[in-house]
Amino acid sequence: MEIARSQNDGIIILAPSGRIDQDTSAAFQAALSGEIAGAAPASVVVDFTAIEYISSVGLRALMIGAKESKASGGKLAVAALR
């Protein structure tokens, strides 16, 4: 899994690619948490266009990110879920 980062009008866009599973979920969670903490309150969009698979562990990482974002007064959105 790789994660591309961009920013548009103050909104951080993270675009992971590949698989988010047991082996990669920690890196995904660290990247997401880092963006949320680094620019709190942050608006973050996670673009799943290039994700082939996300396991329950990956969904857990996303939920942790959502809770962290809410706690810091930010917003987290997801795009292109398949």
Descriptions of predicted regions:
Residues 1-15:
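Short beta-strand/loop segment at the start of cytosolic alpha/beta domains
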Residues 20-82:
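Amphipathic alpha-helical interaction surfaces in cytosolic regulatory modules
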